A protein has these predicted regions:
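Phosphate-binding P-loop
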Residues: 3-10
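Glycine-rich phosphate-binding P-loop
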Residues: 13-31
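Post-Walker A helix-loop "phosphate-sensing" segment adjacent to the P-loop in P-loop NTPases
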Residues: 32-39
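Short, amphipathic alpha-helical "lid/cap" segments that border enzyme active or binding sites
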Residues: 67-71, 180-188
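Short glycine-/polar-rich loops that comprise or flank the Walker A/P-loop
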Residues: 98-102, 167-169
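Small-molecule kinase domains that catalyze NTP-dependent phosphoryl transfer to phosphate-bearing small molecules
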Residues: 130-183
Length: 194
């Protein structure tokens, strides 16, 4: 039986990031290295969309109750389980005020802190083998619809609220200036993995 790695003072790890930022890649690397199970939010939402027979891009076709239940389930897992890697857009936001959670935000920004959507689109094209136009819809349209919905559901309609606010996180990694191996190394060093 494989024994997972114990990290003092860290019960669970969340990994959040915008579409195509590299959050899933970081989460998968952490899961493999630490031998902790990975809960991937995107895969769960994809399943919900399939069950509802709606496009993943059709954020508003997904009833609010699915978002609310999903985020409550994430919070429950973070409170009640241990040695989990939770990767979802709102996982770090959900983890606020829950002790023992190490929250990672993965961004793709230039040196001035500006998001690089063209890089995220390119990554999506390569990872999912979809067209540039499909990737643009994912990154530009679906992301904006998610934000509008989540601002309404979780921030009382505050248009200045974004889950990628760096103040919510213990570690911010910029994949614009680091490759996959460097990014994983930064995360592992930050959590105290030797």
């Amino acid at each position: 039986m494989i024994k997972s790695i114990d990290l003092p003072n860290i019960k669970n790890i969340t990994v959040s990031g915008r579409i195509g930022s590299g959050a899933t890649t970081v989460a998968m690397g952490l899961s493999k290295t630490l031998e902790w199970p990975l809960l991937e939010g995107g895969a769960l939402f994809e399943k919900i969309h399939q069950e509802l027979n709606i496009s993943e891009v059709n954020v508003n076709g997904r009833p609010d109750k699915f978002d609310l239940e999903f985020e409550e389930n994430i919070k429950k897992i973070l409170r009640e389980q241990s040695r989990q890697i939770i990767q979802s857009h709102l996982a770090g936001f959900d983890a606020q005020n829950i002790p023992g959670i190490f929250k990672i935000l993965v961004v793709c920004e230039d040196s001035d802190g500006n998001d690089k959507p063209e890089i995220r689109i390119d990554r999506l094209v390569n990872r999912r083998k979809i067209s540039i136009e499909e990737a643009k819809v994912e990154v530009l349209v679906r992301e904006n619809e998610n934000i509008e919905k989540w601002q309404r559901l979780y921030a009382n309609g505050d248009k200045n609220w974004f889950y990628w606010d760096k103040n919510y996180y213990d570690l911010v990694i910029n994949t614009y200036s680091h490759n996959q191996e460097e990014t994983l190394k930064i995360a592992l060093e930050a959590i105290g993995y030797k």
